[in-house]
Amino acid sequence: MVLCTFQPPKAEAEAPVFDAAVLSLRADIPSQFVWPEEEKPTPDSQEELVVPLIDLGGLVSGHAAVVARSVAAACEQHGFFQVVNHGIDAALIEEAHRCMEAFFGMPLLEKQRAQRRPGESCGYASSFTGRFASRLPWKETLSFRFSPSGDDIVRNYFATILGEEFCHLGEVYQKYCEAMNELSLKIMEVLGMSLGVGRRCFRDFFEGNDSIMRLNYYPPCQKPELTLGTGPHCDPTSLTILHQDHVQGLQVFADGHWRTIRPSSNAFVVNIGDTFMALSNARYKSCLHRAVVNSKVPRKSLAFFLCPGNDRLVRPPAELVDLDHPQAYPDFTWPALLEFTQKHYRSDMKTLDAFTAWINLRIAATGATPE
């Protein structure tokens, strides 16, 4: 297998500055944001992907088995479903969206106080212009770590990186991440039941998680048919819990077509990531998805990425490995996969296969598995 890696921009090439206030009004867009013909979107496509609507209230009302079967069917097909009756306060969700508007509405220079450093996964990123030279996404993001074992880790991040005047944002996102953590562990109980390994198996594995929260802002684009808000990829993480605003843009590649998952204010979109696909021994799918943009209004979303604790070994439970189902991927740690996607490979639908090849090369060269 040939391992393809992304190339950083050449020193002599001037990276474009992604200033949403300027670029969203331009009739043309810089060439670095124009995607290849075979990857260009069809923003007006109305083909919808109807994913199962999972009522988490069934976990406490005697219908846990029904919930687990519905989740299993979705995860075996494409890995996407929505959850309702999730227990997250609607006022907290609304405030998280308001705080996102406040942050991305600031001048570029102010947002760059939280600038993401090369090789890191957290901080402010304006279209990843410092990381890639072409096929740039039409978006801004702010990413930060969350761990239930880290005291006020989100509050401290905002106060330290952006200043004390951003304490309210830190307070809101600390509470939001804590709520997402509880929701993700509840979903892990369902996934454990659905795979027949018990309710506690994956919940216990992720109790001490080291996760990522990301705020996504997709400005309007006057040429939405030429670019993408986020390119086609599978999430390398374990589980993604997404809340969309009222603007559609999330598309999933299912049954050979790009299909839209319409926003719902009272539901979270959940999808399986590569790390959980490995934990499930490839029984559940990490599916290709992307985000498209439009010419009229911005789109915003809140994404919580559940990741294992840094010292956890990603290996499927023994119950999922047998002669008919040998282990699909080598053992690895989340930091090793994260480093691979940040420094060596641009996430796509073949990330786990490329990562496996990279691990095998490292083992052949050094005799040790990357940590």
Task: Specify the residue positions occupied by each region the protein language model found.
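Peripheral, non-catalytic segments flanking oxidoreductase cores
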Residues: 1-371
